Amino acid sequence: MAALAAGEPFSGRATGGDGGVRSDVMAPPAMAEEAKVSCLPLAREVGRRAAAAGGGQGRNFIVSPLSFHAALALVADGARGETQRELLGFLGSPSLAELHRSPTTRLVARLRHLPNTSFACGVWVDRGRALTPEFADAAASRYAAVAEPADFATQPEQARERVNAFVSDATEGLIRDVLPPNSVDSSTVVVLANAVHFKGTWSLPFHPSATFHAPFHLLDGGAVRAPFMTTEIPFERHVAAFPGFTALKLPYKNVGGGGGGDGVPRAAFYMLLLLPDGDGALKLADLYDMAVTTPEFIKKHTPAAEAPVRRLMVPKFKFSFKFEAKSDMRKLGVTRAFAGGDFSGMVTGGDGLFIAEVYHQATIEVDELGTVAAASTAVVMMQKGSSLPPVDFVADRPFLFAVVEELTGAVLFLGHVVNPLAE
C-alpha cells in the first residue's frame, strides 16, 4: 500500500464484514469468559492501585473501557495466530467476527454521529513502511480512522507532538499529552490512538443556588469541605438500596437525535453512582471488585424504578487520571504482543513488530448542569532490534461512578471519587 497523504482516510479494496482479515482465530475460552465485560479486568488492576495510593488515602480514578477496547480491537485486527488469540481473550471475544459485532464496536460507530459525543481514531505509520490493505479497510470501515505518514526514524518528537495534537483537537483540549516525552523513538513503526469526548446535560439539572459546602469523609478517616449539589424539594429519582450499598441513576438528556437506522434510539446515557453504606461493612475497594468482576453487575444494579428521595447530596468533582497498561495486560494473559508477536496483518514486513506501551488518559468534570468527560488510548508499536420506601443518597464519602450507554450496556467511563476536591 502506498504511503498515505496527511489526514487522508484509509482506502483499500472492498472486503466483507470482517474487512478481509481472518475471523476463525478463537480466543481461549477461560480468558474470554473472564474478560467478557470489555476490559474491566484491566480497570480492576488499575483501580486497586489507585484505591491503595497515598498511604490509605486513595486517589481519584477514571478509565474509559470503551476507548481502551476500541484501541486493542484495532490492534487485534492486525494481529495473527496466537498473538491475535491472546488479544481476543483480553477483549472478551471468542473470535474476530464476534469482536466486530460486539456492542462496544457498534456504539463506537454511533458516537461519531451524535451531537454531544465524538470518537476519533488515527494511525501513524513510519514513512518507510506501509499498512496492509486488509488492515486499512478494517480501520476505515469500523473506526473511520485517518492515517498519516510519520517520520519516526529522524523526527520522533515531531511525530509525538502530532499525535498529541490530534487527540487534543478531538477532546476539545481536555487531553493534551496522551503520549508522554520519550514515548516514541527512531524504532517506532506504528502509533494507533483514539479519543472519546462526551458532554451530557442532566435531564433534571441541579440549581447552582442550592449547592452548599459540607464535609466529605475520606478513606483515612479525615474530612474535607466539598461543594454538594442538591434539590430543595422532595421528589422521585431512580434510586435503590442493595445489600451494602445504594445506587443512584442520573439520566442525561437524550442526545441521540432520534432513532437510528434500526428504528431504535441511537443512545441513552446515564451516570450511575454506587455509594457504600456508612457502616463500613462494604469497602469501596470490595464494591469496585464486584463491579468489574461480576458479569452485568452495573446493568443489574441500575435502578429500574423511581422512588421518593428524602435527601439528595452529590458532590461536584473534576479530575484526571493516566496510566501505562503494559504490566497489567501481561498479568491478564497478553504476552506475545509485547514480546515480538505476529502483526503481519497490520504492516507489510511486520516481522518483529511488538507493542512497546499502551497509554491511557481520562478526565471528567461533574457539576450542576451535567458531565464533560474525555479519554484517549494510544498504542505505540516498535520493531525489535529497532411506591417504594424513601431512600437517602448522600454521597459524603468515597463512591464509584460510571457513564453508561443504556441500550448496549457499554461503559464509557468508570472510576471512583475519594476526594472531590483533588484534581
From Swiss-Prot:
SUPFAM superfamilies: Serpins (SSF56574). Keywords: Protease inhibitor, Serine protease inhibitor. Residues 370-394 are annotated as: RCL. The record marks 384-385 as: Reactive bond. The keyword Iron-sulfur does not apply. InterPro entries: Serpin_CS, Serpin_dom, Serpin_fam, Serpin_sf, Serpin_sf_1, Serpin_sf_2. Residues 1-25 are annotated as: Disordered. Signal peptide: none annotated. GO terms for molecular function: serine-type endopeptidase inhibitor activity. One of its GO terms (cellular component) is extracellular space. The reactive center loop (RCL) extends out from the body of the protein and directs binding to the target protease. The protease cleaves the serpin at the reactive site within the RCL, establishing a covalent linkage between the carboxyl group of the serpin reactive site and the serine hydroxyl of the protease. The resulting inactive serpin-protease complex is highly stable. Probable serine protease inhibitor. Belongs to the serpin family. This is Putative serpin-Z12.
